[in-house]
Amino acid sequence: MLLIKRYLMDPESLRRQIMNVYKCYMWKRAFHSNRSLLEVKRREKSLQRKILERILRPKEENAVKKSGFKLWSSHLNNPHKTYMRLEELQRRIMEEVHVEGIKKNDKLFNEINQWHFQNENTSTVRTPTLLIHGYAASSMSFFRNYPGLSKHIRNLYSIDMPASGLSSVPSLEINTTTPLPLDIKFIGENKFKVPYTINANHNKFVIQMYEDFYLDRIEQWRIDNKLGKMNVVGHSFGGYLSFKYAVKYPNSVNKLCLVSPLGVERNIWSVNNNFHSNTLYTIDFKNPNSKFYSKRNMIPKYLFEQQFHILRMMGPLGAKLCWNYIMAAYSRVPSLAYKEYIFELFYGKGGIPEVTTDIFKALFSRCILAKDPLMDSLQYLNVKKLLIVYGQYDWMNKKAGMFMVKELNNLKNCLEGASYLEIPSSGHNLFLDNPESFNQSIVSFLSDETKSP
């Protein structure tokens, strides 16, 4: 009561006290808001920073330490030795993969290394289904998924893409003149202009030739296996190629599943933009549906050009850093043989052939944005059904996937519609991080069984 009387006698003192309480409240609110914002920013770290952290600070739990010198000295060999190691490691990995039905490995016409899982006792997914791996990977990427998927898919196929894994390395032939490339001049923090216009049709024609290195061989593989329409499930760069394959060969694809696909976003590097020369444009760093979109971070030119070759140039240190990265990036994968397989791909001489990196550099900018984005070709896609799926903690731009699904459903060129999904407790390699949830989602999407109302 005395305190109340005091404030009644001195209203200015009461006002100051109320203001102090309000300021304290606002400070606490700002603190918690900033802490939440920092947490969001922490989760949205750039790809470059994530890679650097994995190289320098690999997780200790379940990590197998190896000497950089021993790793380096054991890889002073020719590509044939790398191939033999990959072959042996594939054998070790697949020995631990137990499936219902038949598990068969072939090198079709001595070109495409394929795995075929046949289970005549299931009728859930009767349409043949092909798994397509991402960049610098192989059919071994899905080794944790083969048992669960083949239990419900009658004929499941997985291949090493051309110039990947144990598949042969065809020569790359681009029989045309090199087009004048898109040149972007950045001005300040958020402006850009192009000093000259490009021949968009010529650029797109050349991009198509690079893509056809893969697309035409996938189609020939389908014909050689005497398959009709098939389901296609593609991850990352494999998702990008799966989409382009469905556009070029619409009569070959039934359902299409894009797993954390690369190259979805519209962006300033797209050859489809038709920018005017010497006109100042503003970059949109937030909206992946805008042709003015770009990322803030760009891979240094030398690193982008050299890629995995840099690791070998660094000697024992490069070998050690490569192993550290693999231990961190695949910490949730228990198989040591798989990690050794990935090391052989990344570090082994000829593990990632030059033709593979050349094509990737021709199709993507140093921001890892496509020069012919998927969003620019949605009107040409005609499949029965589409699913785009990401990991909960995926570094890919999930907002772009949401835009893609929305636009496809507006266009109505997917007979049964397009849908978006996230796999919990997983990142970009969601099928490795959470195989059970991934398998269940894929089987549900691909199912040929009629669902009761």
Swiss-Prot record:
It is an enzyme of class 2 (transferase). It comes from Saccharomyces cerevisiae (strain ATCC 204508 / S288c). It is found in: Mitochondrion. Keywords: Acyltransferase, Cell wall biogenesis/degradation, Mitochondrion, Transferase. One of its GO terms (biological process) is phosphatidic acid biosynthetic process. A motif (HXXXXD motif) lies at residues 428-433. Its EC number is 2.3.1.-. Gene3D superfamilies: alpha/beta hydrolase. The keyword Transferase applies. One of its GO terms (molecular function) is phospholipase A2 activity. May be involved in cell wall organization and biogenesis. GO terms for cellular component: mitochondrial inner membrane; mitochondrion. The HXXXXD motif is essential for acyltransferase activity. It holds the Pfam family Abhydrolase_1. The lineage of its organism: Eukaryota, Fungi, Dikarya, Ascomycota, Saccharomycotina. Belongs to the peptidase S33 family. ABHD4/ABHD5 subfamily. This is Protein ECM18. The keyword Acyltransferase applies. Residues 130-435 form the AB hydrolase-1 domain. InterPro entries: AB_hydrolase_1, AB_hydrolase_fold. Present with 143 molecules/cell in log phase SD medium.
